[in-house]
């Protein structure tokens, strides 16, 4: 039968019909929205469906359910060819700044948007939930964001704002009209409450009847027979069929064709593995592949059923069927719970997950263990197979023949006497790739505890999903008892072997997990047998073991934010000290805020793609561009030979714009391809072939130490008599601590647009950078023109965190060269994997310490040698090391001290500035040895910390006097507000009663110096224009990256000029308004630029004074007009430099810092000793921010910094190969904290009555200081591990053990030594290369 074929794509976007006659299967919805439709609210954050910045809502008529359905998707993975006859809603389609949707309004007014780059995606996730359920529960709201990431806020304000939609306890914002208000949950009565950061009563109510309707044209097509779709692109053909007959015919004709439903796997392979599939078949319309049927054996799911449907059907079955029939269903549901975000589960199919045959699949081990049955078909044949150990014959292979397809899968009902569990351990619970997954099933002989069937299946333990076929048969007919447990564990340890260089690494951890999972399964079954009155046959469960079977659940959140209200009588127009929302919050929430890549494309614009080294250290022997030139749209390939000025660049002139003869790291920029589109530039860049001659490479800190490979002389501070101090000490402890690096993971990657002006060498650049001055000067030097020909503009950034302070110039110089060479505008926005590969991150540190102390815990001597991995250029590494050594004392007075620092020169991408700038590393080392002092002395750690704490007027080890030392106040307040002593007793009680779960509690202080340590950078400038209508245009030297700097500066100007903030506007930061600016860094930008603005405003006010005296009853506008008509200038510059700064390392004298910021955090955690997973139960923070300029922004900075620190110290881990290649290049492999990672109880209090006389309006810096407080989580984890080690008889349990940072599940599990870790201890054979190395 011949069917009609359609080659015209029809869909709707925000209610408008789109007809695309030339649909390209390689074009994603994200590209189409941004480039073709100009809808730039939807952002590119990662390109792999891992961050949610591109989230949009899809609506379609579901013919099986006979209703309109709404679901969220990742536009970056959604092919436009899959959108025929559906409706797409983007953030622009639900509201705008003239009329915000309630979702947009609430995230803006609750201060849930900082840099704003992630905001549209989060808005659309929430909007989609409300379209499906206008009155969701708190849990449903939190689950809606499993596929979204935010790097700025710390998530609390987003959740708090959106919980106002919940029917079961939304926040009232402290208004007192909700019994579930999180502020009323605090037990602390020692601090007076403050008014709320926002008032939910101001929010518009949600009215579901006012939402846009589903396009009637599409509704009319619901019963129309579907026609085959065929779209042919430049390289790929897409065919969407609606009958099984068509599909099987096509598969017979084209056995290599790929079947795509959600594109969550194929899309990744095409983008990141450069795989090309010339024919793609979409079977999403076929009835047999999308149907669900309840049969006698179980529930049958069509292979194209999305996982969200599987989840929904299984949930209904669990709710309605007897418990004994749903054991398998609950196991599958547990895996789906953590599988991925809604955006992926809405489109990814169950069949796709099976056929992908991933060795680390979440579902395949569970389905294999469950006795799932699969139906396969090809033209003319159909067969049914069990999904057993034979189904996956090898890596990414199944037993399907090339022309076969998977039709359906039956997930079976469980039988009487059958028990089932599913397990998964990853770096992060939410939306993470598993390290190990498992499905476990046992069937007992009727009325006994004798094993009739046992199935133990694992992912992550081989190149395929495996079943423990050697171990399980030996257990048949055995009783479920301790003897069986020991036999199975011994068998698994022997059977499930991993080579030391196994992909993914973590060999001992993964092997231990298999035993831990079975032990959990054993205990779970034991509990259920007890409930079935069979306990006597198998033994009684130890009550302290019971919690080992409990999964970490999401508990109701309890968040508190306390701050000092403004004085009574302060003018309503004076916004200083008030929780004013971010100036751009409404624009960010509506998608109207313009970021660099959102700037409309120029008519003749070109695209650039970098070509980088694949070797860590090598000579460049040849560059072949012949294949690149064959790509359509190719324009040119740029190398060092094309640079008209200097190819030498970098802070210390030790870098190149393009590598010339030699590369010194993987990711070293060799050249750049320029083409007509980003896609063509990408393809052409892949076509550039480079041959190398390898040279010896230095990758790790240890390699550098061994080879004496360092940058410059050592940094050194010494005070007192170290030899005498150690000789007088009662105890001396020595050790090492390694602190891993960290990726910035700003949601907006590096982006530059260069526009040549066509005369006198002028060029205008739009750059996502924190450092306009260096961007300007580096480009001018490269082009061989004066700085005054280059104008650099920054509207806003989608996050920075130090990563755009210097490394942005790597991209901007290349783009500027391309614009110079072609005479046309050129744009480049790095893909996430490129950005992570090229731009470096936080410096890894290795510290070797020796501390001397008395029995009382008093520190008398300290020596620390710090080593950092600087990478292939010096960049800012020296200043970072200096700050680390400045902060090696943290908050403690140490009479005899020596700190040294060496920067290792290695063949890695240069590491650079990152929030904290070396301070967190120096302070973590301090708290590490401090905790060891407490353990050695047998004293409470909080007592030892308090005993050694500085006092007012003390001199630091670098001889700066501490004035206004509020840290003891912060400490005492945190001890009280956290109920530390009572909770410490509760933790000890919990640990006595639970063997396999342990809790830890720790309180940590911080003292952070404020100023650039390079003293001349401590300057700020401003330009203030007052127009004749009284409006003010404000410009200053700082850039906005989400920290609220522009908002605070408007507040400063408003108070200074005594006018409303509504009259003041900031357009951008640019080099042609405020020249020679310092980078927006060091937490000093509000201090420097705020004072400069104040000075400029005072100049304006002085000029207006005569007119105010002449007309005292006049208005601001009248005084301004009078000044104008009197020919008085209404424009003024302001300048400020921080006084009395300057430090000499030679004499250990002077003041490196203007003042210090202080804070204290108390955190409680619970660890799962069997898996290494942990849950952050509660954090209390007391932070001294002086007299806050804006409590909402400051609390947001405290929370955001803390959560970023939580990632640094417990989660984020960079993996490099021994050859220096980065494995972790995106959100699928590199995990930052997610919504579910933050403390369940998160309480932040700004210290009251502590004005800071050294900064604008008595405020203090806040961006960096709170980050280190997240180490309280790290040390709470370490305390919990210590309790676990004591439980399991480690003779050294109450002494010292190693825990490097970050405290990942692998490190936690391996540190909780027990019988399972002993069974799996292997060690690495000599001369064996591991999968990754500790850099």
Curated annotation (Swiss-Prot):
PROSITE patterns from the UniProt entry: 2FE2S_FER_1, 2FE2S_FER_2, FAD_PCMH, MOLYBDOPTERIN_EUK
InterPro entries referenced in this protein's UniProt entry, alphabetically: 2Fe-2S-bd, 2Fe-2S-bd_dom_sf, 2Fe-2S_ferredoxin-like_sf, 2Fe-2S_ferredoxin-type, 2Fe2S_fd_BS, Ald_Oxase/Xan_DH_a/b, Ald_Oxase/Xan_DH_a/b_sf, Ald_Oxase/xanthine_DH-like
Family assignment from sequence similarity: Belongs to the xanthine dehydrogenase family.
Domain 2Fe-2S ferredoxin-type intervals: 7-94
Cofactor binding description: Binds 1 Mo-molybdopterin (Mo-MPT) cofactor per subunit.
Native source species: Mus musculus (Mouse)
Lineage summary: Eukaryota, Metazoa, Chordata, Craniata, Vertebrata
GO molecular function: 2 iron, 2 sulfur cluster binding; FAD binding; flavin adenine dinucleotide binding; hypoxanthine dehydrogenase activity; hypoxanthine oxidase activity; iron ion binding; molybdenum ion binding; molybdopterin cofactor binding
EC class: oxidoreductase
Pfam family membership, one: MoCoBD_1
Residues annotated for Mo-molybdopterin binding in this entry: 770, 801, 915, 1082
GO biological process terms on file: adenosine catabolic process; allantoin metabolic process; amide catabolic process; AMP catabolic process; dAMP catabolic process; deoxyadenosine catabolic process; deoxyguanosine catabolic process; deoxyinosine catabolic process
Catalysis: reaction(s): xanthine + NAD(+) + H2O = urate + NADH + H(+); hypoxanthine + NAD(+) + H2O = xanthine + NADH + H(+); xanthine + O2 + H2O = urate + H2O2
UniProt keyword annotations, A-Z: 2Fe-2S, Cytoplasm, Disulfide bond, FAD, Flavoprotein, Iron, Iron-sulfur, Metal-binding, Molybdenum, NAD, Oxidoreductase, Peroxisome, Secreted
Positions of the FAD-binding PCMH-type domain: 231-416
Protein name from the UniProt record: Xanthine dehydrogenase/oxidase
Gene3D superfamilies: 3.10.20.30, 3.30.465.10, [2Fe-2S]-binding domain, Aldehyde oxidase/xanthine dehydrogenase, a/b hammerhead, Aldehyde oxidase/xanthine dehydrogenase, molybdopterin binding domain, CO dehydrogenase flavoprotein, C-terminal domain, Uridine Diphospho-n-acetylenolpyruvylglucosamine Reductase, domain 2
Binding site for [2Fe-2S] cluster 1: 46, 51, 54, 76
Induction field: By interferon.
Annotated S-S bridges: 538-995
GO cellular component, one term: extracellular region
Major location (coarse): cytoplasm
């Amino acid at each position: 039968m011949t069917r009609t074929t359609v080659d015209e794509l029809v869909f709707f976007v925000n209610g408008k019909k789109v007809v695309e006659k030339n649909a390209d299967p390689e074009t994603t919805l994200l590209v189409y929205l941004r480039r073709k439709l100009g809808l730039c609210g939807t952002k590119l954050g990662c390109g792999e469906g891992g961050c949610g910045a591109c989230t949009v809502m899809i609506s379609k008529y579901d013919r099986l359910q006979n209703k309109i359905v709404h679901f969220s998707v990742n536009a970056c993975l959604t092919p436009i060819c899959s959108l025929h006859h559906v409706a797409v809603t983007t953030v622009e389609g639900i509201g705008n700044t003239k009329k915000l949707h309630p979702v947009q309004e609430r995230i803006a007014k609750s201060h849930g948007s900082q840099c704003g780059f992630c905001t549209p995606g989060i808005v659309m996730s929430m909007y989609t939930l409300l379209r499906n359920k206008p009155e969701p529960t708190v849990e449903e709201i939190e689950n809606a964001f499993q596929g979204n990431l935010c790097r700025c806020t710390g998530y609390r304000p987003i959740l708090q704002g959106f919980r106002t939609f919940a029917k079961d306890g939304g926040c009232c914002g402290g208004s007192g009209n909700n019994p579930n208000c999180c502020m009323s949950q605090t037990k602390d009565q020692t601090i007076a409450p403050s008014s709320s950061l926002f008032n939910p009563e101001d929010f518009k109510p949600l009215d579901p009847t006012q939402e846009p309707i589903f396009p009637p044209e599409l509704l009319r097509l619901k019963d129309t027979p579907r026609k085959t779709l065929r779209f042919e692109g430049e390289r790929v053909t897409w065919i969407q069929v609606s009958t099984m007959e068509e599909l099987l015919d096509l598969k017979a004709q084209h056995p290599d064709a790929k079947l795509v439903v959600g594109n969550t796997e194929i899309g990744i392979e095409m983008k990141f593995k450069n795989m090309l599939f010339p024919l793609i078949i979409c079977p999403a319309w076929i009835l047999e592949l999308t149907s669900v049927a309840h049969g006698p054996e179980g529930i049958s799911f069509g292979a194209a059923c999305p996982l969200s449907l599987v989840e929904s059907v299984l949930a209904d079955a669990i709710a309605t069927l007897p418990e004994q029939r749903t054991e398998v269903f609950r196991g599958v549901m547990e895996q789906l719970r953590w599988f991925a975000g809604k955006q992926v589960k809405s489109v990814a199919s169950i069949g796709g997950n099976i056929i992908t045959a991933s060795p680390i699949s979440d579902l395949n081990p569970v389905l294999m263990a469950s006795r799932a049955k699969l139906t396969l078909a090809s033209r003319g044949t159909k067969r049914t197979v069990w999904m057993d150990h034979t189904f996956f014959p090898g890596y990414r292979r199944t037993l399907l023949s090339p022309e076969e397809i998977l039709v359906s899968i039956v997930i079976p009902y469980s039988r009487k006497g059958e028990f089932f569990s599913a397990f998964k351990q990853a770096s992060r619970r939410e939306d993470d790739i598993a390290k190990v997954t498992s499905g476990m099933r046992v069937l007992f002989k009727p009325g006994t505890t004798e094993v009739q069937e046992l199935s133990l299946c694992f992912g992550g333990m081989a190149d395929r999903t495996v079943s423990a076929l050697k171990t399980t048969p030996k257990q048949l007919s055995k009783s479920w008892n301790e003897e069986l447990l020991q036999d199975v564990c011994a068998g698994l340890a022997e059977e499930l072997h991993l080579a030391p260089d196994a992909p993914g690494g973590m060999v001992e951890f993964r092997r231990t997990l298999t035993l831990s999972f079975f032990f959990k399964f054993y205990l779970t079954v034991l509990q259920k047998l007890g409930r079935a009155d069979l306990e006597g046959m198998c033994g009684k469960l130890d009550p302290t073991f019971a919690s080992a079977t409990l999964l970490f659940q999401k508990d109701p959140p309890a968040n508190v934010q306390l701050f000092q209200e403004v004085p009574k009588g302060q003018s309503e127009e004076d916004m200083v000290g008030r929780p004013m929302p971010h100036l751009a919050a409404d624009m960010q929430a509506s998608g109207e805020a313009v970021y660099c890549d959102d700037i409309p494309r120029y008519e003749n614009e070109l695209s650039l793609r970098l070509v980088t080294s694949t070797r860590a250290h090598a000579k460049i022997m040849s560059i072949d561009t012949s294949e690149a030139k064959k790509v359509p749209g190719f324009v040119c390939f740029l190398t060092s030979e094309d640079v008209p000025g200097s190819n030498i660049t970098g802070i210390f002139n030790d870098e190149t714009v393009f590598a010339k003869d030699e590369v010194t790291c993987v990711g070293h920029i060799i050249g750049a391809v320029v083409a007509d589109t980003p896609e063509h530039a990408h393809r052409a860049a892949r076509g550039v072939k480079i041959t190398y001659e390898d040279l010896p490479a230095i990758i790790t800190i240890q390699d550098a130490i061994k080879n004496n490979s360092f940058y410059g002389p050592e940094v050194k501070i010494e005070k007192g008599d170290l030899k005498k101090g150690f000789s007088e000490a009662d105890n001396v402890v020595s050790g090492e601590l390694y602190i891993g690096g960290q990726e910035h993971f700003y949601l907006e990657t590096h982006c530059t647009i260069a526009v040549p002006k066509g005369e006198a060498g002028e060029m205008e650049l739009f750059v996502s950078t924190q450092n306009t001055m260096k961007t300007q000067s580096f480009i001018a030097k490269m082009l061989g023109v004066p700085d005054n020909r280059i104008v650099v503009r920054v509207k806003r950034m989608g996050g920075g965190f130090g990563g755009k302070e210097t490394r942005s110039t790597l991209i901007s110089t290349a783009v500027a060269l391309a614009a110079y060479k072609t005479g046309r505008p050129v744009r480049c926005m790095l893909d996430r994997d490129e950005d992570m590969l090229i731009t470096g991150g936080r410096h890894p540190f290795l510290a070797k310490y020796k501390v001397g102390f008395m029995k009382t815990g008093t520190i008398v001597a300290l020596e620390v040698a710090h080593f950092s991995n600087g990478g292939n250029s010096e960049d800012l590494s020296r200043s970072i090391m200096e700050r680390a050594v400045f902060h090696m004392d943290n908050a403690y007075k140490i009479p005899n001290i020596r700190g040294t620092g060496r920067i290792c020169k290695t063949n890695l991408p240069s590491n650079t500035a990152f929030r904290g700038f070396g301070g967190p590393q120096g302070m973590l080392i301090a708290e590490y040895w401090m905790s060891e002092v407490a353990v050695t002395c047998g004293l409470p750690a909080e007592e030892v910390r308090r005993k050694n704490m500085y006092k007012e007027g003390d001199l630091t080890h670098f001889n700066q006097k501490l004035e206004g030392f509020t840290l003891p106040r912060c400490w005492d307040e945190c001890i009280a507000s956290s109920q530390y002593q009572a909770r410490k007793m509760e933790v000890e009680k919990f640990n006595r009663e639970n063997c396999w779960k342990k809790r830890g509690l720790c309180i940590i202080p911080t003292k952070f110096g404020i100023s650039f340590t390079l003293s001349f950078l401590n300057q700020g400038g401003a330009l203030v224009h007052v127009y004749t209508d009284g409006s003010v245009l404000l410009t200053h030297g700082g850039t906005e990256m989400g920290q609220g700097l522009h908002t605070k500066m408007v507040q400063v100007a408003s108070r200074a000029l005594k006018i409303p903030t509504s009259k003041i506007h900031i357009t951008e930061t640019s080099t042609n308004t405020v020249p020679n600016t310092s980078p927006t860094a060091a937490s000093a930008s509000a201090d420097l630029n705020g004072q400069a603005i104040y000075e400029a405003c005072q100049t304006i006010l002085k000029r207006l004074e005569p007119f105010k005296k002449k007309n005292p009853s006049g208005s601001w506008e009248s005084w301004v007009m009078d000044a104008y008509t009197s020919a008085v200038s209404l424009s003024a510059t302001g300048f400020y430099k921080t006084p009395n700064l300057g430090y000499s390392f030679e004499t250990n004298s002077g003041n490196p810092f203007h003042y210090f910021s202080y804070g204290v955090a108390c955190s409680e955690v619970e660890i799962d000793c069997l898996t290494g997973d942990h849950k952050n139960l509660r954090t209390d923070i007391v932070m001294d921010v002086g007299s806050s300029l804006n409590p909402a922004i400051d609390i947001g900075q405290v929370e955001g910094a803390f959560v970023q620190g939580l990632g640094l110290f417990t989660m984020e881990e960079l993996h490099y190969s021994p050859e220096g290649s980065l494995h972790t290049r995106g959100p699928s492999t590199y995990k930052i904290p997610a919504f579910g990672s933050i403390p369940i109880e998160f309480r932040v209090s700004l210290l009251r009555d502590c004005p800071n006389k050294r900064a604008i309006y008595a405020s203090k810096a806040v961006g960096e200081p709170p980050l280190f407080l997240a180490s309280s989580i790290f040390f709470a984890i370490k305390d919990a591990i210590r309790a676990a080690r004591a439980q399991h008889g480690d003779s050294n349990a109450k002494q010292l053990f190693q825990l490097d940072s970050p405290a990942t599940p692998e490190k936690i599990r391996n540190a909780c030594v027990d019988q399972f870790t002993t069974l799996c201890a292997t060690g690495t054979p000599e001369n064996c290369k591991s999968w990754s190395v500790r850099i």
